[in-house]
Amino acid sequence: MSVTMRQMLEAGVHFGHQTRFWNPRMAPFIFGHRNKIHIVNLEKSLPMFQEAQKFVRQLSANKGNVLFVGTKRAARDIVREEAQRAGMPYVDQRWLGGMLTNFKTVKQSIKRLNDLEAQIAEPGRLSKKEILTVQREVDKLNRSLGGIREMGGLPDALFIIDVGYQKGAVVEAKKLGIPVIGVVDTNNSPEGVDYVIPGNDDSARAIRLYARGMADAALEGRAQVISEIVGGEEFVEVEEEEGGVAAE
């Protein structure tokens, strides 16, 4: 689904932060200010958003994984819902230090989570008291790792709501050479972000627009591959039928 400038306006993407909190590195993306609030230039935001979508679409078409990251209160539910819709991994609670740079340890924690769930599922293995204790640990691990437990390995890219709030994620991705798509408000720096989306990172409507747009792009990428495979099969079948008729 393509996003229009009108939709961005309606979602409040253009509302930046108070002028006194601005980051000078965002100057190229600022249109002006109104009532001491910076106004983001949507004529720049829209094509940059579309460029990020194009990247996600191509990545998804090549079976790539985009890790959706949004742990601030306004973003959590939206990021989780849209990532799940697109079949992508996500972090919606807390970014654990080393989540990427120490992925080996993270994989061990995911294995422990799977083992504990298997223990609970096995009838008669644990007492009621033990089940409660284990369940508490499962819940804790699920909060941190539930969204990435099926990821398997490092993601091919990160999509981040509020790069200032998720600075740790940006630093880790940069260290590993993983591309970052990031929503950057006027109070943050675009440094270290490969695909900058200049815009409001606090409004739930704006966050929904970004996350839905990236999820749609991921789904479109996968659908494109499926249609190519199906189309190819249909073409082969037609050729065979024509060959059969000619042979007669």
Swiss-Prot record:
Keywords attached to this entry: Ribonucleoprotein, Ribosomal protein
Key word Ribosomal protein present: yes
Family per similarity comment: Belongs to the universal ribosomal protein uS2 family.
Name of the protein this chain belongs to: Small ribosomal subunit protein uS2
PANTHER family assigned to the protein according to its UniProt record, in alphabetical order: 30S RIBOSOMAL PROTEIN S2 PROKARYOTIC AND ORGANELLAR, SMALL RIBOSOMAL SUBUNIT PROTEIN US2M
Pfam family of the protein (one): Ribosomal_S2
Natural source organism: Thiobacillus denitrificans (strain ATCC 25259 / T1)
InterPro entries: Ribosomal_uS2 (IPR001865), Ribosomal_uS2_bac/mit/plastid (IPR005706), Ribosomal_uS2_CS (IPR018130), Ribosomal_uS2_flav_dom_sf (IPR023591)
GO biological process: translation
Molecular-function GO terms, alphabetical: structural constituent of ribosome
Keyword RNA-binding among record annotations: no
GO cellular component: cytosolic small ribosomal subunit
